[in-house]
Amino acid sequence: MAEMVARLASERAVVVFTKSGCCMCTAVTTLLGELAVSAAVHELDRDPLGKEMEKELARRLYGSSGRGGPAVPAVFIGGSLVGGTSKVMAMHLKGELVPLLKSAGALWL
């Protein structure tokens, strides 16, 4: 499953793993859309392997136990895991998100 998540996370400059109906997922994808980022979005609750991918994302976010909070949204930029809602929003407020998106080729401005 780790290889599958890594492959999916590298398919575009920005990849977001979400669940439909998750308001924090919507907040992150809306922010990226407003920044004109064309992210690949994978809704885990609509994927037959979604539960296994969610466990892998939790492990990546919170360590080997996979415990510590929600696994979605999980945002990858340039193939690297950035984090969830709080990390992405904090980066945006500090002015760090746009430069990272530019360096990954997700923004051209």
UniProtKB/Swiss-Prot annotation:
- Top-rank taxon of the source lineage equals Eukaryota
Q: List the disulfide bonds.
A: C22-C25
Q: What is its main location?
A: cytoplasm
| A GO CC term attached to the entry | cytoplasm
Q: Where is the Glutaredoxin domain?
A: 2-108
Q: Which UniProt keywords apply?
A: Cytoplasm, Disulfide bond, Electron transport, Nucleus, Redox-active center, Transport
Which family, according to the similarity comment?
Answer: Belongs to the glutaredoxin family. CC-type subfamily.
Q: Could you tell me which NCBIfam families the record lists for this protein? A: GlrX-like_plant
Question: What's the protein name?
Answer: Putative glutaredoxin-C11
Q: What does UniProt list as this organism's lineage?
A: Eukaryota, Viridiplantae, Streptophyta, Embryophyta, Tracheophyta
